[in-house]
Structure formats: structure tokens, C-alpha cells
Curated annotation (Swiss-Prot):
Record's function text: Suppressor of RNA-mediated gene silencing, also known as post-transcriptional gene silencing (PTGS), a mechanism of plant viral defense that limits the accumulation of viral RNAs.
Keyword NADP: no
TM segment ranges: none
GO biological process entries: symbiont-mediated suppression of host innate immune response
Full protein name: Suppressor of RNA-mediated gene silencing
InterPro entries found in the cross-reference section: Phytoreo_Pns
Tree of life domain: Viruses
Similarity remark: Belongs to the phytoreovirus non-structural protein 10 family.
């Protein structure tokens, strides 16, 4: 499926800068102005500027958006670059990795900037920067840094992108100031677009809706697959809310703030799924990037409403048995009209299994 790369990059740039612009500037500023050399072997401690920006980074660390080694003052600094900025998608952490796992070698102070999941579709579009092959996702990062007047490379820090694709030999890819020519058009596969849609829904379910914080009664990660349906438009969600609450009174809970329909009271591994979520990424990105024919293809039986729109992802849980396995599947208005998405739960009202 062909897409205009400038439109793709611009949309994701606007999304990220609108919601995270001040935070991004603050992270770059703190990394730039923290002088690690003032921490080591200084009887009077660090200077006031370094202490102030360390405090900012520690605040980001409490929100899981930065990493600082615990023994900074005792570290021997053997080279100039011990600080970094890392751009990454949040789904990388949901699979079980920690921020420490994403650190470039030798880095002891790092700030993390999270980009939209759908932006990583560009990971599979390679471009040449000098004699090195890089994912087109770096174009988005460079555009963000330039528009916010942030330097990607400083005298004591570097910027990296944690790329999920294995096509570039390593996950951590250095983002330099070097210019390169973006291709005007890029070919994206329907499968890649659907996979990133599922990851985007996964992040929304885990971080914003926080649906995994309280699992259904009787749920066991080792035995049960948690199923979530994603819908692309508000009207479809409203239809499902109205019909299911009317059909099974007392069996559903609708959160109209987070736009999610929960099933409550029972749980069975044989149920089709356990929640319905409005995927906002469709309206904010995909709906603008493609023409109507492409949108029909993407949302039809060969795309999100078919096998390409069904994925199993994991969430690192607090259960002793390990991670929660989650299956994501998308439905469109046509699918809802043709069949009832929820199974009949009448026989299960007496308890859970």
C-alpha cells in the first residue's frame, strides 16, 4: 500500500509535539546541561545547575521516562559520552523489557521519548544515510528535534532510536545530524499496518485504560487468553454498548470517559473476548494517510477485519505465573451487522471458571 511519506511523518510529528512537546524539550535540556564530571570526586557535591537538572531527570525517572545509575558520584568517567536520549515505542516495555535493557553501552544517564506505535511502520522502509542503512523512522525523530530546536548530538550525549526491526543489524540505532533525502512515496504492507495498529491498541489498553490492572475473577495467565476487540469509530462502539447492555442486563460496564465496554461478573476461556475498546489511532493517523479505496482495503476482510487484524501480544503482569497473553482483534461496522460479537452468557451467570 503506497503512502506519502511527508504526510505520514507530519501527522505523527504533530501528534507527538502537541501532546509531549514541552516534555521532549525538558528532557533534551536536562541531558544537555547535567555535567557528570561535577559529581565525581567533588567534596562540595555537584554544582547548582547540575543538581537542578538531575532533579528534573529523577522526576522523569519516577514516571519511568528516564534512567539514572544509582552510584553516579562514584562512577569513573572514562570517556566523554555517558548520557543519551533514546526514542522508543511503549510496546517495547510492555513485552517485559526494562528501561535499563534499552540503554546504549556505557550510558549511565538517559532520558526516553516515546513515539506513537504506528510511527514504527516506517521501520521497514530503509534509507541510506552516508553509507549506512537506517529506518525511515529517523526522519520523524529528526523532524521533531528540528522543530523543537533540540540538538540530536551534543558534546556529551548522543541520540538513539530503539528499532524493533532486525533489518539493520542492531536495535539501538544512532541518530545523527546528517541530512538525507526522504523518498516521496513508500510501500507499506497491510500486515505491518495492522500489526502496528494492534500494538497501538495494546499500549492504550495497558497504559491509558489500564485494563490489566484488575483482571476478571478466576483469570489465570497460564490458562486463559485475554481477548480484546478494537473498533474504529465511535458509532460502532455505541451500537455494541447499547445492544449488549440491553441483551444482558448487569453483565456489562461501559466507561464513557475511556471509551471501553467491559464484561463483568463472569470469565471463561471459551468466551470470544473480554473487552471492547475504541482505537483512536484509526481516526488520528490512518484515516488521514490513505485514500478511500485504501481505507476500505485496510479495514476490510483482507486487513483489520480479517486475519491481518488479529494478533497475540503479552503484558508483563504481577501474577506469579508470568505474563498475560492478550489477543487483539478488530471489527468494523459490517462485521457487527453480520453477527453478534458477544456470546450468550446466560448459562455462566452463576459463577466463573
Amino acid at each position: 500500500m503506497e503512502v506519502d511519506t511527508a504526510t505520514f511523518v507530519r501527522l505523527h510529528h504533530e501528534l507527538l509535539c502537541a501532546h509531549e512537546g514541552p516534555s521532549i524539550i525538558s528532557k533534551f535540556d536536562a541531558i544537555k546541561k547535567v555535567k557528570l564530571g561535577t559529581l565525581a570526586n567533588q567534596s562540595g557535591g555537584a554544582n547548582n545547575i547540575t543538581e537542578a537538572f538531575l532533579a528534573k531527570l529523577r522526576n522523569f525517572e519516577r514516571k519511568s521516562e528516564a534512567y539514572l545509575a544509582s552510584d553516579l558520584a562514584e562512577r569513573e568517567l572514562t570517556r566523554d559520552t555517558h548520557k543519551a536520549i533514546v526514542f522508543v515505542t511503549k510496546s517495547v516495555l510492555l513485552g517485559g523489557k526494562s528501561l535499563k535493557d534499552l540503554l546504549p553501552y556505557g550510558v549511565i544517564v538517559c532520558a526516553f521519548i516515546f513515539i506513537p506505535e504506528t510511527a514504527s511502520v516506517l521501520d521497514n522502509v530503509p534509507v541510506m544515510i552516508g553509507n549506512q542503512k537506517r529506518p525511515l523512522t529517523v526522519a520523524l525523530i529528526k523532524y521533531i528535534a528540528k522543530s523543537l530546536n533540540c540538538d540530536l548530538v551534543g558534546d556529551s550525549y548522543d541520540t538513539f532510536y530503539y528499532c524493533n526491526s532486525s533489518a539493520y543489524g542492531k536495535n539501538l540505532i544512532s541518530v545523527s545530524d546528517n541530512d538525507f533525502s526522504n523518498p516521496q512515496r513508500a510501500l507499506l504492507s497491510v500486515g505491518d499496518l495492522c500489526y502496528q495498529a494492534a500494538r497501538s491498541l495494546h499500549v492504550a489498553a495497558a497504559n491509558y485504560i489500564r485494563i490489566f490492572d484488575r483482571m476478571p475473577p478466576g483469570f489465570q495467565p497460564s490458562k486463559h487468553l485475554f481477548r480484546i476487540i478494537g473498533v474504529l469509530d465511535m458509532e460502532t462502539l455505541k451500537t455494541m454498548v447499547t445492544s449488549n447492555i440491553a441483551r444482558e442486563p448487569g453483565m456489562f460496564c461501559h466507561d464513557n470517559v475511556k471509551d471501553v465496554l467491559h464484561r463483568i461478573g463472569v470469565y471463561s476461556p471459551n468466551h470470544h473476548f473480554s473487552a471492547v475498546i475504541l482505537w483512536r489511532g484509526w481516526a488520528s493517523t490512518y484515516a488521514y494517510m490513505f485514500n478511500q479505496e485504501q481505507l476500505n482495503m485496510l479495514s476490510g476482510t483482507s486487513g483489520l477485519a480479517g486475519d491481518f487484524g488479529k494478533y497475540k501480544l503479552t503484558y508483563g503482569s504481577t501474577f506469579d505465573e508470568g505474563v498475560i497473553h492478550v489477543q487483539y482483534q478488530f471489527v468494523t461496522p459490517e462485521v457487527v451487522r453480520k453477527r453478534n460479537i458477544y456470546p450468550d452468557l446466560s448459562a455462566l451467570k452463576g459463577g466463573s471458571s
